[in-house]
Amino acid sequence: MNADLILFNGQFHTVDRENPRASAVAISNGRFVAVGTDAEAMALRGSGTQVIDLKGRCVIPGLNDSHLHLIRGGLNYNLELRWEGVPSLADALRMLKDQADRTPTPQWVRVVGGWNEFQFAEKRMPTLEELNQAAPDTPVFVLHLYDRALLNRAALRVAGYTRNTPNPPGGEIVRDANGEPTGMLVARPNAMILYSTLAKGPKLPLEYQVNSTRQFMRELNRLGLTSAIDAGGGFQNYPDDYQVIEQLAKDQQLTVRIAYNLFTQKPKEELTDFKNWTSSVTLHQGDDYLRHNGAGEMLVFSAADFEDFLEPRPDLPQTMEDELEPVVRHLVEQRWPFRLHATYNESISRMLDVFEKVNRDIPFNGLPWFFDHAETITPQNIERVRALGGGIAIQDRMAFQGEYFVERYGAKAAEATPPIKRMLAEGVPVGAGTDATRVSSYNPWTSLYWMVSGRTVGGLELHAEGLSRQTALELFTHGSAWFSSEQGKKGMIKVGQLADVAALSADFFSVDEEAIKWIESVLTVVGGKVVYAAGDFEKLGPASVPVLPDWSPVVKVPGHWRPTSPMQTQVHHCSGPCGVHSHSHDKARLSNAPVSDFAGFWGAFGCSCFAF
């Protein structure tokens, strides 16, 4: 047998405990056929074999996000300006102004998730007046975690919010002394006001949604992600909003493997939704690139406990158990796996009561099910999860909300939030993920950094000793495979498994902790095919697809901020008046000139600010 692809001269970390290290792999028909030495892989070389010298790069199994809103995120990716990783608010506001200047009527500028104020040098959020100055005429919507959204005056007008607009249930339209909306929307604690407002913005046409999803997958491939479990999401209707991803699958253009769960959209009609789906959708229908994965993360709306740590923990309504039980009972009867969003231990206790009651009547008997999030779950409830054969999918929400959690509950409580080590010690399946794109970043390296370092994106230490790098990697690969019932099929670099790997820009196992969050892939392989390549390997990868529309934020800001990005020569980095020149700070920040270009005339003197 001749291999289709051989990768050699690498430092492979296989996540296979029986064969943890290798220098080469051979791949045939999309699966590993040899994992070992260069000589062992080269023995399968034929005349048509592609051979790639990895030049000593660290290579890992392709990362697998156990909770990513990829389908919804893909439809909107080309509409959204990314503030993920941006080092200062001054930079972020300048990016916002630049995009507002490029955005045609009636489109909005949207900053949706992946950032918080603690990442900025200024350690604060933008003010509403700053948004109005940056974009006086273009509608701007800035989403901040699950707790609030900022709208400029133009966005308030097109959204139709006036002094006569009532507050929706669970939300607040903040008003000034005269009763006029200020532009601040607050979840108290329900985030529906934020998402329903976002949904008022224009959508991309189908052709552009296809392009948008391809751009998002390319960005995920750049970060070494090769698989994801899509958790559904609000305003993500089945089957309408799955048209794009199904077309890409049909055209063999998926570069990320997707297992998708179905998320109910109709309060008080959840059971009807699931009865319709279990009768029309075959469990696990699809293939290794796109397959159905069961129900959730929303099973009933009364069981949703949004994790807004700026607000007190919400008590779920007394009707929750009566509404959740028939849905779970139906899913167990139909042998449909399910997942359920649950942040707080108090919620989890009540949900487990329902699960145990159903299990007494209709045994789960190995049916895959799991909680998503579980930040404050107790050891007792971890044991109950294990007894029912469940798992826990954890995400890095504390990396973005840790400061708020500590402020409300204290540093001691944050030390084991979520209690990943206890979950592992109890033998509960654990998979890692991000919960991107509306709150956390989709960057898996931000998540891996948080798991290893115990720090937030703002640098706050939540716990002194994080997970080992090996354990963190296992959770983001082999661990996540359990949550789509694909354990043994992917997650390891092992003979017989799907050939998904990422060669990294730096050695994850030896770089300084702070450098982890800047790692990316230089060569990403899915099913034995190169889907992304950069640096020394760039010529081996497919060409990038032009971004549509041409005014999309992705044209100038192609994803997560990068320390070596050309954007650095365009943004203004200082956060206070220049001590030398005492220039007009806002004028400099809001200018379209490259005010921090150290190769320019003023930059040669150490500061371009003097131009202002």
Name every feature range the model reports, one short phrase each:
Residues 329-339, 343-369, 373-374, 379-383, ...:
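His/Asp/Glu-enriched, well-ordered alpha-helical/loop segment
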Residues 250-255, 284-285, 358-366:
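Short helix-capping segments at alpha-helix termini
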Residues 270, 302-306, 383, 404, ...:
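Short conserved micro-motifs at the rims of enzyme active sites and ligand-binding pockets
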Residues 268-285, 393:
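Substrate-binding cleft/loops of secretory-pathway carbohydrate-active enzymes
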Residues 3-4, 8-10, 334, 387, ...:
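In a subset of proteins, long, contiguous C-terminal domains/tails are tracked
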Residues 75-77, 160-162, 349, 403, ...:
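Short, function-defining helix-loop hinge/capping sites that tune catalysis or transport
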Residues 112, 143, 395, 502-505, ...:
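Residue-level recognition of conserved beta-strand edge/terminus positions
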Residues 2-8, 13, 17-276, 291-347, ...:
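Divalent metal-binding segments
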